Every structure is written in C-alpha cells, then in structure tokens.
Amino acid sequence: MANYTAADVKRLRELTGAGMMASKNALVEADGDFDKAVELLRIKGAKDVGKRAERATAEGLVAAKDGALIELNSETDFVAKNAEFQSVADQIVAAAAAAKATDIDALKAAKVGDTTVEQVIADLSAKIGEKLELRRVAYFDGNVETYLHKRAADLPPAVGVLVEYTGDGENGTEAAHAVALQIAALKAKYLTREDVPEDVVANERRIAEETARNEGKPEQALPKIVEGRVTGFYKDVVLLDQPSVSDNKKTVKALLDEAGVTVTRFVRFEVGQA
C-alpha cells in the first residue's frame, strides 16, 4: 500500500516542477516523508526546487514606515487591493514603528488610537468577511534604507526590504538603496558566510557530492567540484558574496567597501513566501 496520497504527488509536482512519475518515485524512496522527497528530487536535478518550495499561497501586502516593516495577509488579492485594507496596514506599521515592535505579540498589543492592532484586524476581518493574518514584523532603529516593490501596478507592494547600515553622506544613502534593490531582486538570506548555519552548509556539501556522483564525475574530482558548487551556493544566498546587480564584475561587498558603507543587518519580506 502506498504511503503517500495523490494530493502529496500533486503538491510535490507543484513545488519542484518534477514529473508525475519522478514525484511518485521520490515519495516511495522517501517512505512518504515529503521533505525528504523534495531533497531527493533536488539531488536528481529537478528544476527550481529551492525557489518553488519557499512559496505559500497567501495574498496581502507589505508596508513600511520609520524602520518598521510588516506583512499583512488576506485570503484574496481582491481584499489586498481594498483601500480600507491598505489603510489599516498603514495604521499597523505606524503602530509598529511607534512601539518599536519586533515580534507579533508585541505588535498585536500596540495601540491604534483607543484600541489595539489585534482589535483593528479583527474588526476589519468581520467587516469584509475574510480571514486576515498579521504574519510578521521587523523593526530596525539605526540608519535604515527601505524599499517596497509591487508585482503589478494595480496591487499593493508585495516585497519589502529594510537595510540597516553605517556610512554617511550621499554615497552612503545611494549604496544602501542599491543594496535594498539587490536584496529585493536576488533574495539574499544571509549577510555573511559566517551567518549561514553549519548544518545548512553541510547539507549543501552532501547534496553537491551526491549530485556529482549521480552525474558520473570521477571520484578524485569530487572535492574540487563540491567546493565550486558550495561557492556557487554562497553567491546565491549570501548578500556580500553576490555579484552586484549594478556592476556584475564586482561583489556587493566590494561596492560597499568603495562607498565606505557597512551593512549591519537586513530583512526581506515577500507576501506568500517563507
């Protein structure tokens, strides 16, 4: 008897882009463990596994103000376009900035006039008939560059970035803005290599080695191949290692060094993604 369902196969295909039989075989090999099946398909070369696996199904928007960034989810993009929904999001992010909120519980308890953020959301949810969720919040209190990006002209911003940095003058502001655009576009997850958890790097090495073996690479060449692929992984996920979108002959770190700017931390929210 199969230890997976048709729904599991469908979900795996949607997340990885793999074919039906490949998805079924991966679930069989993984003994029904969905996450393991995703990893197996990645080793075997399924397209876009990492990118697709991050997707969720929420609609909504991101909003930013004075060092605060929030994600407010709705069930449909129809509600996300609603002026009252967007106005409430503006009130919530203003409350986040005023309260310097860095977690959802603190933000829900923050004041909006005579009531709380939590009550404002509950009232709007009852009025429009959709479940609304305050998904996440961030707050930085240093020099902060903010960038919001729309997926379509008729939709509210779906991608939001905060970049905290040190560096004065026009060059500092321009460099921080360029970095915010970079993060929005290329989705860096970590600031430096040292920020990447050891278990994540170890898993990348293991996957790189297994993939190279599956490709028939000679055993003596594996260490060099693995190092090359791990370096490529760093270029994908580490901000300072990424080639700059404004000058791909230089890394983000090189351009920041030239501008005399140091990024101390950043955060990126995208509606519907982890």
From Swiss-Prot:
Function comment: Associates with the EF-Tu.GDP complex and induces the exchange of GDP to GTP. It remains bound to the aminoacyl-tRNA.EF-Tu.GTP complex up to the GTP hydrolysis stage on the ribosome.
Organism: Mycobacterium sp. (strain KMS)
Family stated for the protein in its record: Belongs to the EF-Ts family.
GO cellular component, one term: cytoplasm
Name of the protein this chain belongs to: Elongation factor Ts
Keyword Transmembrane helix: no
Record GO terms (molecular function): translation elongation factor activity
Localization: Cytoplasm
InterPro entries: EF-Ts_dimer_sf, Transl_elong_EFTs/EF1B, Transl_elong_EFTs/EF1B_dimer, Transl_elong_Ts_CS, UBA-like_sf
Top-rank taxon: Bacteria
Keywords for this protein: Cytoplasm, Elongation factor, Protein biosynthesis
Keyword set includes Transcription regulation: no
Region listing for Involved in Mg(2+) ion dislocation from EF-Tu, in residue ranges: 76-79
